[in-house]
Amino acid sequence: MDKDKVLLVLHGKQAGNEEVRAAVAAQREAGRELAVRVTWEDGDARRIVEEALAAGFATLVAGGGDGTLREVAEALARGRGEASLAILPLGTANDFARAAGIPLEPAAALALLDQTARPIDLGAVNGKLFLNMATGGFGSKVTANTSEDLKKVLGGAAYLLTGLTRFSEVHAAQGRFSAPDFQWEGEFLALGIGNGRQAGGGHVLCPQARVDDGLLDVSILPTPQDMVGTLGTLLGGGNGVESLFVRARVPWLEVEAAEGLDVNLDGEPLEGRKLRFSVSPGALRVHLPAGSPLLREPPRED
């Protein structure tokens, strides 16, 4: 593996992004060997990562939104190599990047390639991996059903608008949650199982989550009496509902839902009646800003 070889896996819709082109050119002018591959359809990111690992690339850059980031991160982790991950946030929500303190400007984001990569955890559920968060309940449906055109025009506010227009469909989910020293059963409106802190366009469901603590943060919003009003508050930023959440920090979590539970894994839908969530400590090395809020400690000196 050549430690200087970097490959940017770029979402196809960003191929004409002039800021990205300028940032890539600046990195090359500074002496970095930076190649670019563009995705076109589902599965491309995984295939490109596999080919890059076989070709000896030392670092992969995920250029896109949270979905692209999840695909690249999962493929890297399954490759079980030494390659690291950098993040070029180009989506609508960019939830993981925002929580981690990664700049949204392409040049500043690519400058993090100079930061030492830190080992971070990945979440897993029923054989699938996720970098940021698994969400369930009404919130996962909002995220999954928010159109790409609406997100392009309104940005993160698109999630709020979609939620508001779907109030007539609101109904609570029912589940039983089991983990070491944690048991909860009942109806809930929203669920977050976080490696990261926020999802769905800026909704901070797991405010204390860290990506290097070997644990998952669980946040359950039990069904309140004023369900529609509470949902509006949650989608509008969450102020005023913090005290309603049931929270835990666990190495694994089992969820049983007799009627099935819709879960969103960083943009990928999953449904099941029995789900087991776990964490893979230090599964991936990622270039994060010094002092990132998602890290527990500064890097060790070699």
UniProtKB/Swiss-Prot annotation:
Entry keywords, A to Z: ATP-binding, Cytoplasm, Kinase, Lipid biosynthesis, Lipid metabolism, Magnesium, Metal-binding, Nucleotide-binding, Phospholipid biosynthesis, Phospholipid metabolism, Transferase
UniProt: ATP binding residues: 39, 65-71, 92
Family in the record: Belongs to the diacylglycerol/lipid kinase family. YegS lipid kinase subfamily.
Residues at the active site: 268
Cited function: Probably phosphorylates lipids; the in vivo substrate is unknown.
Pfam families xref list: DAGK_cat, YegS_C
Cofactor dependence: Mg(2+); Ca(2+)
Protein name from the UniProt record: Probable lipid kinase YegS-like
Gene Ontology cellular component annotations, sorted alphabetically: cytoplasm; plasma membrane
Organism in which the protein naturally occurs: Pseudomonas aeruginosa (strain UCBPP-PA14)
GO biological process, one term: phospholipid biosynthetic process
PANTHER family registered for this protein in UniProt: LIPID KINASE YEGS (PTHR12358:SF106), SPHINGOSINE KINASE (PTHR12358)
